[in-house]
Amino acid sequence: SPSYKSRSVLSGLERVYELGLTDCAMYVFILLLGFYILMRTFRARPPVAVFGAVAWAFSSYFFIIIGAGHLWKVLTLAFIPPTIAGMVLCYRGKYLWGGVMTMFFIAWQILSNHLQMTYYFIFAMVLMSVGFLITAIREKQLVRFAKGVGIFVVASLIGVAVNSSNLYHTYQYSKQTMRGSSELATAGKHDQSAASGLSKEYITQWSYGVGETFSLLVPNVKGGASGAMTANEKAQADSHYAEYMQTLQQLYPQLGGSTPGLSQYWGEQPGTSGPVYVGAFVCMLFILSLFYSKGAVSRCLMLVMVLSMLLSWGHNFPAFTNWMIDNFPMYNKFRAVSSILVVAEFAIPLLAALTLSRMVSEPDLLRKKPIPLYISFGVTAGLCLLFAITPGTFFGDCLTGNEHKILNELRGILQPEMVNSFATD
């Protein structure tokens, strides 16, 4: 993003928060620190807060996007948990600390210049706010909540205002890009979004598959990262794969091309650097939270997770996705809807850590209510076992579009040979 003199003080303060660390160490550190701060605002004990921070920071997505060079996205995501922590403090009557934290972390989010992630997490913050509103009504603390909302909004506006120069110039040049209005597209006929933003096809080109969502539990449920199967040691040791490649080497030269290879990844996306994975133990604690979590905020966090999954499916869930693109403000300005699954990757560790926090603070909980633990362990272990024993039951076709093309080409080679053989007989 452009560097303006007006941002030098804000950038300097950010470097202090990052302890002057560089490269990957800095990204991991601020991911850990930000979520730790959030857990402490939820009154979790330090060891539990550390667990939550590790579960968030060491989920696979962050290392994938660091490797892919999406460094501004990592920075933005690292500043989101402490922003939400500021919101929580505001709603709980800690107006000064909540306002200061909100102001700085929103300012740093926008400074990181990846507005798509900020936009996606607005959904999470709105739903969490609904949860806090319900709690305030139950506890008869509406006045405190209203003050908190006011301070949070003012602090947010200040955080946005200090980045006004960057936002203004981004807005101006966006009009001349594919995210601006198109002079060629006609709204209303086929794709309303193309007239004022990106086309639906482009927005949903990277859409997470419905079955692919199980990668949160089992990382390679769709093969893992894109790449030639020749790099996979297990495939090289498989005799069937060796026979397949030998057959291709014999047949494919007839088409005048080089021998193709199979891809490790066979999901619905055009390609991927790796799956979104949070870990089996974290998933088990999340399932446990369905039984042990208390309060409206936790329930709203579950809605956050479900919403992000539905939106991440993109063209695999067209009714909801198309409605969002056509009707929700600014939703058609961002591509790769699969990336919204990072919101679920936030909600799941948070709910898991909050559940662990309750178990630590109430030592007799498991003794009094042991059945939910058996259910959560059984569901997690049962799914993993089923995927291991009968993977074909859940994921029948393991071929991508490219592999189907290879098969069709092979049929084209073999069919004339079979006809000639029949004619000779």
Q: For each of these PLM feature ranges, what is it?
A:
Residues A53, G69-I80, C90-A107, L115-S156, ...:
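Contiguous transmembrane helix-bundle modules in multi-pass membrane proteins
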Residues Y36-L38, Y61, G86, A107-W108, ...:
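Alpha-helical transmembrane segments of multipass membrane proteins
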Residues S1-K5, V9, S165-S289, G392-D425:
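Periplasmic/ER-lumenal interhelical loops and adjacent helix-loop junctions
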Residues F35-A44, I84-M87, Y91, L290, ...:
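Transmembrane-helix signature of membrane-embedded glycosylation machinery that interfaces
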Residues M26-F42, V282-L285:
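Transmembrane-helix motifs of polytopic, lipid-linked glycan transferases
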Residues M39-F58, K94-G99:
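Transmembrane-helix signature of polytopic, membrane-embedded enzymes
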Residues Y4-L33, I66-L75, T272-S273, S338-V342:
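Loop-to-helix entry region of an early transmembrane alpha helix in multi-pass inner-membrane enzymes
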